[in-house]
Structure formats: C-alpha cells, structure tokens
C-alpha cells in the first residue's frame, strides 16, 4: 500500500463524519420536535440508521487494509489474491456507502417537510432540501436497480454535485449565519390555539 497513512486518515475522517452526523441528527430532532414529534423522531431514526450502516461499512476498509498490509494474509493467499480481495472489499464499501444514502434521503425528506411547515427557514431552502432528498434517492437506488448504471453514473453524480450538495450547503450556511426563525413558528402556534381557546370560552 503506497499511502497507508493517508488510507488510515481517510478511515478516521469517515468515523468523525459519522459521529458528527449523529450529533446533527439529534440536534434536528430537538429543533423539529415541537413541529411534529413523531415525524421528527422518524427522521432522527433514519439518520441513526444511516450512521450505523456507514459505521459497519467502515469494516470493509479495515479488512482491505489488513489484506494490503498484513504479511500473514499475503503469505496465506498470495499477493495477487490479497490485492484482489482488498479491491473487492473497497468496492463493497463504495456500494454500502451508496445504500446508506437511502436512509439519509429519508431523513432529509422528512426534515425538509417539517422545515417547510414550520417556516423556521425560508421555504425555498426547505424545498431545495426535499429536492436534494429525491436526488439522493435516485442516485442510491439507481446503483442497484440499473443494470447499465455505469452508462448513467456521470449524470447521477452531476445531479449530486449541482443539486443535492448546494441545497445542503445553503441550508447549513443559513443555519450557521441566520439561525432559525422561531418567532414565525410561535405566531403560527398562537393562531392555531386561538380557535380552541375561543371555543372553550
């Protein structure tokens, strides 16, 4: 393995990303819980399912690393077989990563809907997040459903780069710079409570 240190660093970076994603999922749960507790919980569970899938999927890279660096394995099966097996596990990791995006797509689809009805952020950002979720769905499912996926791989990857990623980036920047508009949600809740209070009186 020519760059073992870089390979190990990439595994650690993935692990850090997974842990951060769990924290983000929990934060969104508490943010959207007042809007709809059940849907917010469902979105968080999908996020955790994605994190669990990605965490297990890291084992593929660790096994590949052992095959490429462990003299015992090379001696047992031969260098060519060890390299072939390592490549197989790296390919399996790539497939597992794409399948995990199904859970991510479900999570941000629900979050996009809840953000839309809550008006915590401008609705255009919520719509873009929903569109991003559909893009992730299409990308992930196409890798399994399409026999000739390689012929369309470039198109799906371009959709991620120019649709899904900008939508996520815009929402993240808005939340970091502007935050959420809790006043709009509070006003909406007040309006919804007024008819009930009028009836009780």
Regions found by a protein language model. Name each.
Residues 1-201:
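Hydrophobic, aromatic-enriched alpha-helical segments typical of multi-pass transmembrane helices
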């Amino acid at each position: 393995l020519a760059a073992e240190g870089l390979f190990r660093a990439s595994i650690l970076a993935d692990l850090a990303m997974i842990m951060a994603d769990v924290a983000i999922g929990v934060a969104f749960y508490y943010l959207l819980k007042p809007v709809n507790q059940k849907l917010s919980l469902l979105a968080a569970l999908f996020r955790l399912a994605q994190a669990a899938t990605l965490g297990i999927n890291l084992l593929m890279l660790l096994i590949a690393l052992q095959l490429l660096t462990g003299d015992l394995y090379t001696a047992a099966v031969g260098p060519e077989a060890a390299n072939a097996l390592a490549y197989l596990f790296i390919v399996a990791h790539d497939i597992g990563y794409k399948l995990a995006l199904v859970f991510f797509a479900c999570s941000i689809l629900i979050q996009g809907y809840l953000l839309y009805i809550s008006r915590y952020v401008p609705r255009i950002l919520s719509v873009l997040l929903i569109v991003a979720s559909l893009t992730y769905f299409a990308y992930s499912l196409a890798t399994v459903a399409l026999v000739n996926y390689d012929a369309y791989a470039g198109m799906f990857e371009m959709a991620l780069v120019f649709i899904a990623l900008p939508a996520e980036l815009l929402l993240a920047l808005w939340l970091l710079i502007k935050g959420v508009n809790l006043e709009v949600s509070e006003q909406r809740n007040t309006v919804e409570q007024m008819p009930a209070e009028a009836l009780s009186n």
